[in-house]
Amino acid sequence: MKKSINEQKTIFIILLSNIFVAFLGIGLIIPVMPSFMKIMHLSGSTMGYLVAAFAISQLITSPFAGRWVDRFGRKKMIILGLLIFSLSELIFGLGTHVSIFYFSRILGGVSAAFIMPAVTAYVADITTLKERSKAMGYVSAAISTGFIIGPGAGGFIAGFGIRMPFFFASAIALIAAVTSVFILKESLSIEERHQLSSHTKESNFIKDLKRSIHPVYFIAFIIVFVMAFGLSAYETVFSLFSDHKFGFTPKDIAAIITISSIVAVVIQVLLFGKLVNKLGEKRMIQLCLITGAILAFVSTVMSGFLTVLLVTCFIFLAFDLLRPALTAHLSNMAGNQQGFVAGMNSTYTSLGNIFGPALGGILFDLNIHYPFLFAGFVMIVGLGLTMVWKEKKNDAAALN
């Protein structure tokens, strides 16, 4: 019988710390992007491609990672992902040419592909269906907290040198990996892993993609793509937009992102479980998409620090509530295919994170408002998809 979350506090703290560390490193780069852009004489499109390189790497690796999570165990994949992440941040901190930055982001994508499905599957393994949405909410809160500390730490530590934040991220990732070696235990027995492996050993990327377009999964995965596409397009150019339009410094940008993230994560932790129980996952997803779309359009006419802060707070909140609602929905339908579903979730996220930043950077070079208009349009498309989304509770088990 599975234990409650309260009975497994140490395990949850380690898991949440690991996912926090991964997204901390991503958050670190946000406030220093304009400075890197100026120092390296890079265009907005190049910055977008740099973000997209991370996602391309994650996309290519995710299907394999999803199967390896089932075959080799969650713990091994988490530790390996953290070690690769540590190396990628160290390389970025030492880099002196844009090609080195690309290589670093590619390694970062591999690490994310390892860590995300492993942590998600681990949480699903040790939680009951009743507590799973709550647990996924904690995972999403850890991600959000990474964005809270990341930009804040990046803006502060950059005062000691623009590369120092990356050395810091590398060090704490290494510490997290070592801690996981000694504290985490495999969530599944060898027999259970063999059973899962028997389902996945003949699997391949094309086959997994074909499985993902089954009506049980497809609309949910497309919404994952839409969410990642719109949010990544917004996030990629936000710091550049703030620098170009308002002349915000790295500390200003860090303050906006940090405060917005704190507000979002506090509300998420306090209200997510209650809202999902009252509205249901589907209505929660729809509410978040329409809120995000409206605020993306509002972003093009906002002015002044306080207005930017207010709009950003609500956009972060919308996506911080959307992410766990989607993850919980997919996890609940996955049955004994947690590794596959988590891996494909990461795959569709990567697809959105490839095209969103790349197109966002190109649109930014044309007009600094275009990325926000486009992000809003994409979220409206996602909202439309949820209107034809029919939830089928038992079909996923039949696919296993």
Curated annotation (Swiss-Prot):
The keyword Transport applies. GO terms for cellular component: plasma membrane. Signal peptide: none annotated. One of its GO terms (biological process) is response to antibiotic. Pfam families: MFS_1. It is a multi-pass membrane protein. It is found in: Cell membrane. SUPFAM superfamilies: MFS general substrate transporter. It comes from the Bacteria. The chain crosses the membrane at residues 11-31, 46-66, 78-98, 106-126, 142-162, 164-184, 213-233, 253-273, 297-317, 346-366, 368-388. Energy-dependent efflux pump responsible for decreased drug accumulation in multi-drug-resistant cells. Probably uses a transmembrane proton gradient as the energy source. Causes the efflux of a variety of toxic substances, including such structurally diverse compounds as ethidium bromide, rhodamine and acridine dyes, tetraphenylphosphonium, puromycin, chloramphenicol, doxorubicin, and fluoroquinolone antibiotics. PANTHER family: MAJOR FACILITATOR SUPERFAMILY DOMAIN-CONTAINING PROTEIN 10, MULTIDRUG RESISTANCE PROTEIN 2. This is Multidrug resistance protein 2.
